[in-house]
Amino acid sequence: MESPHPGLSDMDIPLNTSLIETMHASPTGEMALLDLHLDRLLRSAQALGFANPPRESIRRQIVEHVACTPLKGSDLRVRLLMGPSGKVALESYTLPPLTGVPLVAISPVRLKSPEPFLQHKTTYRPWYADTMSWLTDHPDFFDLIYLNEKNEVCEGSRSNVYLMQDGVWVTPPLTCGLLGGVVRRQLLASGQVVEKPIPAASLLTHPGQLRLSNGLRGWFDVQLVDFPGKLNRNN
């Protein structure tokens, strides 16, 4: 069967894979980036051959969930899962504020830029499994930044990456191997950021001019430090 997306086919999609959207809801229930989250969710559903439920039906489920959660009145992390059938599941958690300037380091693991699943936010993320465990054990770090086989910056395990170069904020293009984040899309559309490959060496020569973004935290400064130890949490 021909794939609906280059490099993907029915056999390539692991069993029980779901699409994910992780969204911020304000204490008043506002979700400023909801339309961008829905755009990405439905675009990936089509690419992966998932059922594509009506956009307004998904929106209504999200809005009703946020309105009814006992955690409302706080900043929330709202997690949406959608399986191949198009069925949506929602969970909410309180979202603590960031404190200080978060730390990041360069991951010792490399990504392969042609990997098609990098451009879709799904539960199939084996290349990030050790990083997520490591971050749990190292709460001072917000994320690890990944490089690809060309020694170019890709993304963090839960964020997009930006570097100030010659007075302009740049972020890697999707062809470097990364997820198109909702904040990244907003920044590109507004002209605050431009796409350009970022060689790994540039991170080391501009360590104080680095930002990350994601749908929960927005766009924020981080501090690059040396990676401490090994990625495998058992070492």
Residue ranges, per PLM feature:
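Helix-start/capping segments and mature chain N-termini
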Residues: M1-R77, L81-N235
